[in-house]
């Protein structure tokens, strides 16, 4: 379970224009898929950083309140410990790559933790099957398309078997076909009982998958919709808060 308890955060001078958050209270139950939506700068990305520990361990700023993930207080444990529980896929997958070839990139996290070679091989084989990556193995990462890079990033996170997956605007650099692949990955994780947090401005592909849509504005939670409540909104109500209709044509 994820619990954000009265958290306020403002960035330091280097990131002073980034969207902070104000008195956020949020609980996410195990196995839920939750979408954080709202305009750019509303605080969506900041919430993902609170969950994966990049705040307060990487981004400087002033923080009040606490965040717990699976009973552990994020501010009091090393970032590498949080990373064992929370896997992150960033808006630009290239920013999280450590290797040039795809196979080494996927296994990097396991190798970094010193896991046995046989265990890594077994996990790799399973991940290749789960993500249908046979044609992408042994490739130069920088010769891949945006969608292929994201598949590798997701595979590199999934092989670590975290309980929680956090994604920051994962569809922003994808075409329609790659967005369908992204939905399939999210559906696979959900079928495994993973807790999923997605910061997103395109919402059409998440219908029928997300359990909640949380609208963030001005660093605060304005609305917390269940899937049924979100479906009951009119097109005008959806468009007012999120870019729901931006890619509506791709539904057909």
Identify the residue ranges that each predicted region occupies:
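Conserved ABC ATPase signature
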Residues: 140-144, 148
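ABC ATPase NBD Q-loop/coupling interface
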Residues: 66-81
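Hydrophobic anchor residue at the start of the ABC signature
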Residues: 154-155
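Catalytic Walker B motif of ABC-type/P-loop ATPase nucleotide-binding domains
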Residues: 165-168
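H-loop/switch region of ABC-family ATPase nucleotide-binding domains
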Residues: 200-201
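Conserved ABC ATPase "signature" region
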Residues: 118-136
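Conserved small/polar residues in nucleotide/adenosyl-binding loops
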Residues: 245-252
């Amino acid at each position: 379970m994820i619990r954000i308890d009265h958290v306020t955060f403002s960035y330091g001078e280097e990131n002073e224009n980034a969207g902070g958050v104000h008195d956020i209270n949020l609980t996410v139950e195990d196995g839920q898929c939750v979408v954080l939506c709202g305009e750019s700068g509303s605080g969506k990305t900041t919430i993902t950083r609170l969950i994966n520990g990049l705040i307060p361990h990487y981004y400087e700023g002033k923080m009040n309140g606490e965040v717990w993930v699976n009973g552990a207080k994020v501010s009091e444990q090393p970032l590498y410990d949080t990373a064992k529980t929370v896997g992150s896929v960033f808006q630009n997958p290239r920013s999280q790559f450590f290797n040039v070839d795809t196979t080494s990139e996927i296994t990097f996290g396991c190798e970094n933790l010193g896991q046995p070679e046989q265990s890594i091989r077994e996990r790799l084989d399973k991940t290749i099957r789960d993500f249908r990556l046979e044609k992408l193995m042994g490739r130069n990462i920088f010769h891949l398309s945006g969608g292929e890079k994201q598949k590798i990033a997701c595979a590199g996170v999934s092989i670590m078997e975290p309980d929680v997956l956090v994604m920051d605007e994962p569809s922003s650099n994808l075409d329609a076909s790659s967005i369908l692949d992204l939905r399939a990955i999210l559906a696979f994780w959900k079928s495994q009982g993973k807790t999923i947090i997605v910061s997103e401005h395109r919402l059409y592909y998440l219908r029928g998958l997300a359990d909640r849509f949380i609208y963030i504005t001005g660093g605060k939670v304005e609305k917390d919709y269940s899937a049924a409540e979100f479906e009951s909104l009119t097109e005008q109500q959806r468009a007012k808060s999120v870019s729901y209709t931006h890619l509506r044509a791709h539904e057909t």
